[in-house]
Amino acid sequence: AKDFMARHGIPTAAYGKFTDIDEAIAFIHDHGPPIVVKADGLAAGKGVIIAQTFAEAEAAVRDMLAGNVFGEAGHRVVIEEFLTGEEASFIVMADGKNILPLATSQDHKALEEGDRGPNTGGMGAYSPAPVVDSDLHERVMREIIEPTVRGMAADGAPFTGFLYAGLMISPSGEPRVLEYNVRFGDPETQPVMMRLRSSLPALCLAAIHGRLDTCTADWDARAALGVVMAAGGYPGSYDKGRAISGLDAAAESGCQVFHAGTTLADGNVVTSGGRVLCVTALGNTVADAAARAYRGVDVIDWDGAVARRDIGYRAIARERESERQHQDG
């Protein structure tokens, strides 16, 4: 993906690939910490080090190349500039040529409030993402999404399906690509789908037949927010088979409860994974959607259930600031 972006002029973090320790360390000294050192390959999700000092970065390189602590995955390292700013998820549909953007969203990857703790698959999300205003939306389409779809076609692999660009928006408003996925995001999908009024199967059929240029997507103007409820211990080891209560009460409160790590045992819904449920609600504002979603979270329970209590905090802060400015004006 990094080579693809370099080839097609798509903005991303500066990077280099190395098999030689001295060359890797020279790159580190050229760019300086904090810097990201990755084992180039599969390393059970643990082959990524965010080094805060030169010493940490050099140690990571030596471990991965000389010590080879990650086995085959560590025979080469990718070293990337560490990007700062605010993340956003930008998902579109493509039919090989035409592009239909879907609603913007933002997820929360860290386990704990304030974006602290280990990274997870995602502890909650909301849509739309206020950080992506109309000007930035146009820029992302022009500088990232359109060159990506054109680039895949030019490389002989025209793409039909869902394209997910994970973006970092710098403090000055510059979008850069963190990652691509050729699927929807989880948990971004849940709030995005809550807002979609158009027929998803009809849009998928249009993409398959190369007719996305004839389609538009109709969105509920309200915000949607989803809170992931996870098993205690996740993303590490956790218990399974815990009986879940309160699902009917959450539905009666107006929430949509999306199941992930659940199964049926003797007629009862029990936990079967790390991320168990995503409790999602619509609201006139992100703050309103959050309040409704947390009402659902508060009536669902099982032994060891955990959830972040601050999903949507960036957008809620923006809403409060906007309201304050309106009152002052």
Identify the residue ranges that each predicted region occupies:
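Short amphipathic alpha-helical segments
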Residues: 45-47, 225, 273-278
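Internal nucleotide-binding/catalytic subdomain
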Residues: 47-189
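Generic C-terminus detector
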Residues: 262-266, 271-324, 328-329
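Active-site "cap" helix and flanking loop/linker of ATP-utilizing ligase/carboxylase catalytic domains
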Residues: 141-163, 181-252, 265
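Short, conserved charged micro-motifs
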Residues: 23-24, 56-59, 235-237, 284-291
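Short beta-strand/turn micro-motifs at beta-sheet edges
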Residues: 112-114, 214-216, 262-269
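Conserved anion/nucleotide-ligand pocket segment
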Residues: 32-54, 192
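Conserved N-proximal alpha/beta basic substrate-recognition cap immediately N-terminal to
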Residues: 1-12, 23-30, 36
